[in-house]
Amino acid sequence: PRMAAQECDCDFNTSGDTVFYNEYLEFYEQTYMKEPLEKRGVDKNLWVWESADYSRLYMVVADVARGDGKYYSAFHVIDIESNTQVAEYKGQIGTKEFGHLLVGIANEYNEALLVVENANIGWSTIQTILDRGYQNMYYSPKSDALNAESYFDKYQDKSKMVPGFTMSTRTRPMVIGKFAEYVSD
């Protein structure tokens, strides 16, 4: 049942079930969560635990929402070398404004690799990022090939790639499975 909502592309919050057991979530909350060093922005929804260290590599991973209603756009800044979350944002913001915010935070964190979900309204945010000329953006393969060789072959030729990360019924189980494997170790 825990994977059913995820595999059917359902909303975890409304399905009443999650991928991770509540005990695991509570353990991580009690063990690892700490107050941010800084809360930034008009809405104070940008939480920073570590400022950029210019000797480190970072990744900014973003999920785009419309900017109104009950859904929120969010991003996480990850130190790639230590696998540590150093900042996060969750807020109701327009898709274009979110693109500008992402470019700003990615530049602040050493021109971080910017990974934005490209489904539906994510395109508006991605277009803003591309219009700003941000260079270090993740591209997904256009095909459904699952092996690393096909990915790296295509990575050399952006005409075979699409900007952003494509979350789909094929990639979602892989992403969640890999994350579950990571946090359980």
Give the role of each language-model region.
Residues Q156-K158:
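Luminal/periplasmic acceptor-recognition loop/helix of membrane-associated glycosyltransferases
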Residues G164:
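Extracytoplasmic catalytic/substrate-binding loops of multi-pass membrane glycan-assembly enzymes
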Residues P1-F152, M161, T169, P173-G177, ...:
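RNase H-like, metal-dependent nuclease domains and their acidic two-metal-ion catalytic environment used
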